[in-house]
From Swiss-Prot:
N-acetylvaline modifications at: 1
One GO MF term: peroxidase activity
Protein species of origin: Mustela putorius furo (European domestic ferret)
UniProt protein name: Hemoglobin subunit beta
Disulfide bonds: none
Amino acid sequence: VHLTGEEKAAVTALWGKVNVDEVGGETLGRLLVVYPWTQRFFDSFGDLSSPDAVMSNPKVKAHGKKVLNSFSEGLKNLDNLKGTFAKLSELHCDKLHVDPENFKLLGNVLVCVLAHHFGKEFTPQVQAAYQKVVAGVANALAHKYH
């Protein structure tokens, strides 16, 4: 991902304020509610029968935290996203058979959640930088599919 120094600084500064537990759970939960077909990958998570059930599900929250911790690793390695996500790409492609389009959806949901949490602080410039990052991460996660 090519980010200017200003964009990297904006992404890093905002990410330092992110509560990974809260934002991770909300991001994955929203993905599962807004795009319900993604629930098929989470059969073992128990009750996903309603938006409230999804958003309060402890397994959704725990996996959301895990997802955002991986995203944090990506932010530390923006110059090598494919390398950073190689094993996860392989897992999601070969074992889990996740449609790579879902990575783009998740990235866009993350941007929505960040905008919701940070309001005016999430300026159009910050959003533009994050859109580049989530697109780069989605591309890296889809790499094994190519």
